Amino acid sequence: NRWLTEKVLPDSDGRFYSMLSLPFNDAEESLRQVEKFGDRKHVGGFMVTTVRNTGVHENQYMKVYRAIEERGLVLSFHSGPNWAEPIFKTCNRFLSVHALGFSWYNILHCTNWVINGMCERFPKLPVLWIESGLAWIPFLMQKLDHEYMLRPSEAPLLKKKPSDYMRDMYYSTQPMEIQDMKALECTFRMMNAETQLMYSSDYPHWDFDLPSTIYDLPFLSEKAKHNILGGTAARLFKLQPRNEKQKENLKKFGNLTAAA
């Protein structure tokens, strides 16, 4: 974090913005990192890499979330597979672990985040879920809504359905499942992709997505493409337009206010 904020970002001439890492296994150190680096220029927020054995709703993290929220920054959870996890040791193919792992951990943490009322406790804290694909989102929306309607007393902090909270959060595209275009279109509709989804490439990994993955989707409007490919990120992270063309596009689609 020190290297990024003292060397990389200052030397980038405004071209780089960064999410800083949180040492999530140590809540007190996580808070110190936010307090020390959270106000540095071109820092957009803080990122938690896959948490495997700690609940994101545990009380030890409340001061961390509050500190990020007070600074107007973004909290993100970046998922990833772990073949060393006992349950995943039953998988005998990388394909299986890769398919399940990236989605599974964010499913787990998103469930704990929503059901434990974190969206109500930190209503001004934008939350971003990274590198889990998109297919898990409508699945989890439906499952949590179903369970919540049967047992609302177990989620006393909620003031609306779990899916409504999930539609208020943000998601990265990669790796986007494009095999069934109708299913993908339904996913985009359910998650309010036009305002909540942000393109990510994951380059140079072997399964990276080109910008054309979004631009070539036949069911997206021009505004939706603009938002997903950069407009939403400009609004969320308060990115400054670097030239008049960028400024015109942000203004055209309603994303300039926070960016300029």
Question: For the regions a protein language model found, what residue spans apply to each?
Answer:
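Aromatic-anchored helix/helix-loop segment that forms the rim or "lid"
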Residues: 101-108, 153-183
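Short, conserved clusters of charged catalytic residues that mark active-site
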Residues: 59, 63, 110-113, 179-183, ...
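Catalytic metal-binding/acid-base residues of hydrolase active sites
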Residues: 52, 80-81, 133, 176-177, ...
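Mid-to-C-terminal alpha-helical segments outside catalytic/metal-binding sites
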Residues: 2-10, 32-35, 116-117, 125-126, ...
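Aromatic-lined glycan-binding groove of carbohydrate-active enzymes
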Residues: 79-83, 114-168
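Active-site gating/metal-coordination segments in enzymes
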Residues: 1-109
